[in-house]
Amino acid sequence: MTSTANYNNSGKDSYFSEIKKSELGLIKNNLSTAINERNADKIKDILQRIIYYMTIGMDVSVLFPDVIMVASSNDIIIKKLVYLYIVHYSKSNPDLLLLVVNTLRRDCIDRNPIIRGLALRSLCSLDSKNTLEYATIEINRSLTDFSGYVRKTALLGLAKLYHLSKEAFDLDIIIPKIFDMIMDQDPQVIVNAVSTLNEIKPGWSFTFDLVQHLMIKFKEFNEWSQCIILECLSRYTPSSEDESLDILNLLDDRLSHSNSALTLSTIKIFLKYTDEFEEIQEQVYERIKEPLITLMESSESNETSFTILHHIHLLMSRSPRLFNRYYKHFYCKFDDPLYIKTLKVQVLKEIASNQTFIESIDEILQELSEYVYEGDHSLCKQSINAITVIAQKHKNTQEKYPIDESVLEKIFLPYLSVSSNLGGAGDDNISINEGILSFILISLKDFLRVFPKHLKTVLPYINENLIGIGSVSNYTLPPSANESVLWMLGESPNSQVNSPYIIEEFFNEKFDQQPTFVKTQLLTTSLKVFFDRPGEMLPILKRILKKCCSDLSQDPGLHEISLFYSRIILLLDIDKAASIINSSKQTTSINTFLEDEINEYRDKIFDEFNTLSVLFGKHSTKFIKNKKQIENEKLQFLENQKNYLLSITDGNQNNNQNNNQNNNQNNNQNNNQNNQNNNNQNNNSKQLLKEIESSPNNLIDTFILDQQPELSPELFQSLWLSLEDGHKIDIQLDSPIDNSEIESVMSKQGIICLAFGSVDQQTKLYYYARQNLSFDIDFNSEQNQQQPQPIFIIEILIDENTLLMSILFKSPILKTLHNKFIPKFLSILSIPIPKIFN
């Protein structure tokens, strides 16, 4: 681009051409020419070019005085471009900003309502306390403007200014005005008034007249505005059942809306207003289930489907059988992401757990069994767990619906049979099948706890398909799976399985690698088998007890249990000992499940329907921090950083004192020892090093920096804010310098550049370094070597106009900073800047 004409001839694509170094100067000249010629088309093209540069991150703030010259133009497009530029650079040009305020205020009373609204929005977006007074005046005037566009803009500007300075507004005056504007006839003004009131006075209460007005105007709002209104209405409590029904009748058609946010907001109102009317709420549940199913299946976004699915899952905590007839809609699709498949499995589990039709339960169980071979271990585990829970939940109905036998014969036993093919499969198949087998064994234990009568059926399969091809030790099973197999052997010790020899082999090969709970289960199983087969089990039991009692330090808990079992066997007869150990076999009824407690917890977040609480599965107080908590955490973080820095300084000083004391003590104690000469030699060497260090001629050579220091930007910022200025040096440069050359020289010496850039004609560079204490003469003891290394942080500012370089140093150890680091830093800096010491 070499002339002004290029702006006219280049077309729309010219805004995205390659940036040239001389572009800003050319734009400045062309803009001045276009202003003098009063050529609106040229001004538009130039301003569009400037805005493009601004959006890609290029600093065009130098053009601020020239751009504000066209702010008084009557062209709306030019005004939009100018105001966009001014708002973006308002903070970096606070002095020049006052030159635009008069233009903005003049536009706030323009005849054109679009210009009035544009000027008002820009004036409120300056985010400067210098313009706050002027903006407040215009806001108060515009709240009563005859144009709805200006009034709704003024309301949003009011919310912005209130957060900028709460003292600028008298709430006793401004809040009644906002309430009056809620009764406005313009729908957008009403919505903005509600939103502004939410910002200024959260939790404000409705009146009947206000609700009636909102309901009358409700159909005029757009769908997102309706969501805002409904969210506020969820805080309103109708005075009677008739009032509730009137509101719900007006909102009924919103349940079938294609916007999922609007549908969920409407459902929240329906559930809230019928909470005290059980019969009506049952009808509401029936009314909302089909819209939810439709939204879940018709949504093109997986994220939306996931959100709807979570709300369906939450509704099932209130109405467990609500979706019983719709269970096929929750079958996993081949292209569903894992997070949706996992949630669908949970929904299917709850549907089947509360299902009464055996055919439906069988279909769900068969569907879940197919997911076991999906390939993902997480989904496999969820599916097996769901199958187990479904069977357990139907324990009391097994006479009518023998779910336990169906689960055992169609799912668990076939999986155990498949596992016998492990030996002939490839490595990949072995890994997958072993993972499935582990989940099966763990769930099988939970299944048999509820249905112990099936133990005699399961153990032969385990003996044939797992133990019969080698033994449990041939499989790389996790500890929980090993513990499950051992538990099953102990619960049926009189079976035909060779339990003593299985236990012996497991003890010989795997015992030492197992965690405590597996060792404890092995010990308990050994005792139970011993009571039924003492002749075979006695030698093995002696070895196990001896092993468990031998080492107290390794496993004190197991040691105590083994001593307890030993005393039972020695002090009591076999029958009494067996009655004590086998007391857990007494018949107990399992009626309460963890899922029931989870449902109660889910019921507590029902009031936060259509919020993130539903997705997170926790109340908002658990993941949203208030301002006080955030402020306390910030103060605690700064305090921790301060203590850390103080510990570095104090640690080095204490180490030096301790070393001196230790040296004096060693000198006194070693006077009569044979190694006196060696100690004297060490002391002389240390004294010599101290003399070298204290010598000005060796001030730099004995100071070594870490060549690969690490410091995060967050920690750098925290240190910079918490440390006081250590030393500042000003250097007048003769000519501009190459930042990359300085960075290259510094990095070779262990001084690393964290960030650099140019802002407002000022180049900024930030460096950090750490001292390598392994070369320090006081860094001798192992304790000292564990101390953090001293940190040095540097800021270099170069004025691009005057070429004045200002260097600011900070460090928690000022003595080392002044005596060692600064001379070394300046010595390194003299390489790219030779005249630095002149």
From Swiss-Prot:
Residues 582-673 are annotated as: Hinge. Keywords: Golgi apparatus, Membrane, Protein transport, Transport. It comes from the Eukaryota. Residues 674-838 are annotated as: Ear. SUPFAM superfamilies: ARM repeat (SSF48371). GO terms for biological process: intracellular protein transport; vesicle-mediated transport. One of its GO terms (cellular component) is clathrin adaptor complex. It is found in: Golgi apparatus, trans-Golgi network membrane. InterPro entries: AP_beta, AP_complex_bsu_1_2_4, ARM-like, ARM-type_fold, B-adaptin_app_sub_C, Clathrin/coatomer_adapt-like_N, TBP_dom_sf. One of its GO terms (molecular function) is clathrin binding. Residues 652-683 have a biased composition (Low complexity). Its main location: Golgi. Probable component of an adaptor protein complex. Adaptor protein complexes are vesicle coat components involved both in vesicle formation and cargo selection. They control the vesicular transport of proteins in different trafficking pathways. May be part of the adaptor protein complex 4 (AP-4), a heterotetramer composed of two large adaptins (epsilon-type subunitand beta-type subunit), a medium adaptin (mu-type subunit) and a small adaptin (sigma-type). PANTHER family: ADAPTOR COMPLEX SUBUNIT BETA FAMILY MEMBER. Belongs to the adaptor complexes large subunit family. This is AP-4 complex subunit beta.
